[in-house]
Amino acid sequence: MKEKIRKKILLASEEPGVYIFKNKGVPIYIGKAKRLSSRLRSYLNPQTEKVFRIVEEADELETIVVMNEREAFILEANLIKKYRPKYNVRLKDTNFYPYIRISDDEIPYVEIVKRKLRDGTYFGPYTSVQFVRNLLEILQKIMGFRTCKSDLKRIKRPCFLYHLGRCIGPCIGNIESHEEAIRKLREFLSGNMEEVFDYLKEKMETHSKMLDFENAAKYRDLLLNLSNVLESQGVVFEENINCDVLVHAHDLFVVLRVRNGYLVGKISFEMEGGSVEDFIREYYISGRGDIPKTLILESDLDEMDYSSLGFEYVGPPRSTTEEDLLEKAKKNLENELKMRGLRKEALEELMKLLNMKDFPYRIEGIDISHLQGKYTVASLVVFEDGFPKKSDYRRYKIEQDHPDDYESIRTVVKRRYSKHPLPNLLFVDGGIGQVNAAIEALKEIGKDCPVVGLAKKEETVVFENREIHLPHDHPVLRLLVQIRDETHRFAVSYHRKRREKESLRSVLDNVPGIGPIRKKKLIEHFGSLENIRSASLEEIARVIGSTEIARRVLDIL
């Protein structure tokens, strides 16, 4: 420990605050304390390897005194979020979780996003993208909020969704009605769902009494569909409870999110060496998750006043319902741990089966998709520690005039690994020919990496010019099938998207006045024929700069 740091520790204040260990001006560890002097003195006699490394590496110590522990907690969270010091524990998503965002525009729009920023109101995270899509589709039919991002001041004719009855139409002056729709949506997503259910029941009963059975059936179906979408996420509780339930074991944290009696999500995170307090700071205080009124834990925390942060209660269950929720959270945690054990077992078996030197922590999978040689694309998916890492997925467009999977594989392997590091194992969807094509491509660029394939016919594992037959329930085969299915799904979805864009190009070629520049603008803005069909004349005209040509586009479509 540097002498100047020792002196600062001995002179530290008794007040609450935040301390920052730095190396060459860069924060390497940030902590908080109810009493800075007491906390910092523990660093004079390091008891763990981590603390020893911090004090040995640090050449500077900065302290910031605040009014109370709450301020210290929030400041610590904000500083860690800003600087991401290497010795602070970090929250690692084990999956991608979507959010619902209400924009901060004068007339807001609603969308599904991957990340939470400071540019609107966010709700989530949710467990499933499909669940969020289904939920928003039903809620839009009920409330009529807008989901388009168009500049409403320039629109004179409402879009397709307005004519379908799914949007109120703020673009044609229905501003107050849209404000009410957004208010209802905020209330619903905040957990206050009774208003929407009561509204649907009232409408259904009113139309039924008037013998207007067609509209009564419409509201009945909306009510049933909304209930079904919410129930698809899991258990429905008798009480209108709004809470999160947090449990953890080892480095794994699981949160059950319950809103208005509905289990709306289960999310899991890894945090190496993290405590419950660390998780609350990283997940809630830093803004990744919305703060619920109640946070159920397995036991009491320290005397920290979490109510001042927005929680009304943080602690163990107070009712049988909360006890049941805690038990459900524990079972989910056990299942997550079991799954991780099975994945690790599968990876260890894979390592033995292929006689690999290194543990296959990172596996990258490649698949080719085309239509009789046209619109050829390649997908590259990534699995780390047996789980998909979607943020590292990549797509490649391959130009060729005839179907040749081997050449396509060689092309994408050379493009990928001439610029990027090799994985521990490369997976190719296919048999011996596809595997050898990948190996040849690696040799051409002077690289070497184990390559494994999975032949489609009998789910046969292919490695080093030999076929390995495994039982259908073998953990290695199950893992490789999952990787194969994911590479195929990702490749097919990109191929479909490329094919739609090419179809759009060919249709636009027949529109007088649409040249290469306008065609490019339309494709980049709308992406598909369906999106152009549902757009207004004004929106198309704004993109290409001509109302007359925009009218021709709509006429042809």
UniProtKB/Swiss-Prot annotation:
Keyword terms, alphabetized: Cytoplasm, DNA damage, DNA excision, DNA repair, Excision nuclease, SOS response
Locations listed in the record: Cytoplasm
Domain of life: Bacteria
GO terms for MF: DNA binding; excinuclease ABC activity
Keyword Plastid: no
GO biological process terms held by the UniProt record: nucleotide-excision repair; SOS response
Start and end residues of each UVR domain: 194-229
Gene Ontology cellular component annotations, sorted alphabetically: cytoplasm; excinuclease repair complex
Domain GIY-YIG: from-to ranges: 14-89
Function: The UvrABC repair system catalyzes the recognition and processing of DNA lesions. UvrC both incises the 5' and 3' sides of the lesion. The N-terminal half is responsible for the 3' incision and the C-terminal half is responsible for the 5' incision.
Subunit structure: Interacts with UvrB in an incision complex.
Family label: Belongs to the UvrC family.
Protein name: UvrABC system protein C
Organism of origin: Thermotoga sp. (strain RQ2)
Taxonomic lineage of the native organism: Bacteria, Thermotogati, Thermotogota, Thermotogae, Thermotogales
